[in-house]
Amino acid sequence: MKKTLLCLSLAIMSAGFMALKPANASAKAADAQNQPDPNSYSIVKVQGNPDWTLIPELSADNILWKPDCGIRAFGQFCYDDSSLYVHLRAVEKEIRASFTAPLSPVYQDSCLEFFFMPEGRDRYFNFEINPNGCLYIECGRDRRDRFVLYRSDLQERFQIRTERDENGREVYYQIPLDFIRLFYPDFQFSGILNANVYKCGDKTDHPHYLSWNPITSEKPDFHRPEDFGMMIFEN
């Protein structure tokens, strides 16, 4: 295990990332009992820049832990040989966009989040982005056993683009295959991603929590890979 973690750390650093704030391993084990059947979504393959009008859309329509305040969130995903493309949008009138600095707690702003893990693996990524395009990334097994990933050019590395109008906001970005292979060297865009899509805003005027796949926790907690849905790569 120590040798594996050392190799992983060296691979991350060689790609220009810093792994920050390692945490003590949590004793929590995922309880798979009494889990509802997960939602599923097909990730279509594209050639060239995605035409988002042709990409299936999922809805993060599970309203969690707070009263419904009318906010809605949606996601679209596709891929080619080099990247996974992500488009997330929110219908949200009152937007909070306070943070611009790296490593900021963007979940306190109007935040759109994508958590994913290749099937059969034990570490997942969380990508959290606010309306300013400020990105926060972690990788790990659960809420406690994880580390922050940082490099100075995150927006350029993931080609983040944000848009905003009177009805809400959206974000586009792409996750390169070679980034995922830093952690899973044999990963291919095939098979299944276990994943969830979230919308939150802990310090907005109307705090809210939404998810694509249902969450079985009684208190706010997005770090539950046992509650991920299935995203299936189409050939």
Regions found by a protein language model. Give the residues of each.
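Bacterial Sec-dependent N-terminal signal peptides
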Residues: 1-29
